[in-house]
């Protein structure tokens, strides 16, 4: 198969290689997926770059955990009728060496999720890490029907999906963006109230839409927003944080304690397997009824995977995808 891989960590152009590797074979309980589109996440580029001193977990790594494609072979114990089924894939390179930046990837059966016929491969390849993280942030502490959910970074990959999932789940969503110039990019049908963090007094602006406080916070930068979250959370609220800018974060401990606020930290590789499966079911169901859309940014052929990684590292709008040749 044609694939891209790295045998050591470093800058994308220095370590990513392309060529042919043996076709993988599915083992018991596994399926092989013929990949059409591979999704690139910040975690993929951080692993490749040795972020936070991480080392190579395997001698050779095919990067990327997310993808869409077609099941073309199954291992023992898997229903043979899965062959030919369109799927979206999550976790392909989570505690596994060979991910989705290749013509074929092998994953446990349940990590190849049936993709409804009317949904495109680009959407499917965009659901894995950001979608499952968003789902966990919104629903880990129970249903949100009738609740107020504050989503920081509502235009981001996780934030956008979190807002859409919360809306699908019956919540009223308040979103934040960094600058007032971004306000008109937010869909008011999903996020009826959006606050720009540069407005001067974002806490008062949020409180204007939630006088008794917000019940859930989906947090993209705990170190930057800890004081703001403290100012707007309701009694027994949950702050679910999947990111931060500073490794060490100061918290307004006593005010949060007196409000019985729960702080939940989210690392998607280690979510419970049952939670991932439920997230996959809900993401597919929401997407099937048109409740989820994804902003697609740049697309790169597999041969240009280093450019795709550099694009993710540089930041910018939209999901970065790699198309895999047939």
PLM regions and their residue ranges:
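Glycine-rich phosphate-binding loop and adjacent beta-alpha segment
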Residues: 224-291, 324-326
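Short glycine/proline-centered loop/turn elements that form peptide/ligand docking sites
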Residues: 76-77, 175-185, 198, 221-226, ...
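NAD(P)H cofactor-binding loop motif with strongest signal on the N-terminal glycine-rich segment
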Residues: 153-154, 221, 244
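Short amphipathic alpha-helix with an adjacent loop that forms part of the alpha/beta core around
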Residues: 201-212
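NAD(P)H dinucleotide-binding glycine-rich loop of Rossmann-like/cofactor-binding domains
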Residues: 80, 90-153
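Mid-domain Rossmann-like dinucleotide-binding core that forms the NAD(H)/NADP(H) cofactor-binding site
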Residues: 125-199
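C-terminal capping/lid region of NAD(P)-dependent oxidoreductase domains
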Residues: 291-295, 306-326
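Glycine-rich beta-strand-centered segment in the early N-terminal region that forms part
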Residues: 22-40, 51-93
């Amino acid at each position: 198969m044609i694939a891209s891989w790295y045998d050591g960590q470093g800058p994308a152009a220095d370590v990513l290689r392309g060529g042919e590797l043996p076709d993988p074979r599915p083992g018991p309980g596994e399926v092989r997926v013929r990949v059409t589109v591979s999704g690139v996440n910040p975690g993929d580029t951080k692993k490749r770059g040795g972020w936070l001193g991480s080392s190579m977990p395997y001698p050779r790594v095919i990067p990327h955990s997310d993808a869409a494609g077609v099941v073309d072979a199954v291992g023992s114990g898997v229903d043979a009728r899965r062959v030919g089924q369109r799927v979206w894939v999550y976790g392909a390179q989570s505690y596994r060496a060979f991910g989705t930046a290749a013509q074929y990837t092998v994953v446990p059966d349940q990590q190849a999720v049936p993709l409804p016929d009317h949904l495109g491969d680009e959407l499917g390849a965009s659901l894995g890490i950001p979608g499952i993280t968003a789902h966990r942030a919104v629903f880990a502490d129970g249903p949100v029907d009738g609740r107020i959910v504050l989503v920081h970074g509502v235009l981001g990959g996780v934030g956008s999906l979190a807002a859409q999932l919360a809306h699908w789940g019956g919540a009223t969503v308040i979103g934040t963006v960094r600058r007032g110039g971004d306000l008109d990019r937010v869909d008011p049908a999903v996020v009826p109230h959006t606050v720009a963090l540069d407005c001067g007094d974002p806490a008062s602006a949020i409180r204007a839409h939630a006088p008794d406080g917000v019940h859930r916070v989906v947090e993209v930068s705990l170190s930057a927003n800890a004081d703001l979250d403290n100012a707007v959370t309701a009694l027994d609220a949950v702050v679910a944080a999947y990111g931060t800018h500073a490794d060490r974060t100061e918290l307004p401990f006593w005010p949060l304690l007196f409000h019985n606020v729960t702080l939940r930290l989210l690392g998607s590789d280690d979510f419970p397997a049952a939670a991932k499966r439920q997230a996959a079911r809900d993401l597919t169901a929401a997407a099937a009824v048109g409740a989820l859309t994804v902003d697609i940014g740049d697309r790169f052929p597999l041969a240009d995977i280093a450019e795709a990684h550099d694009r993710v590292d540089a930041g910018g709008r939209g999901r970065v995808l790699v198309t895999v040749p047939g």
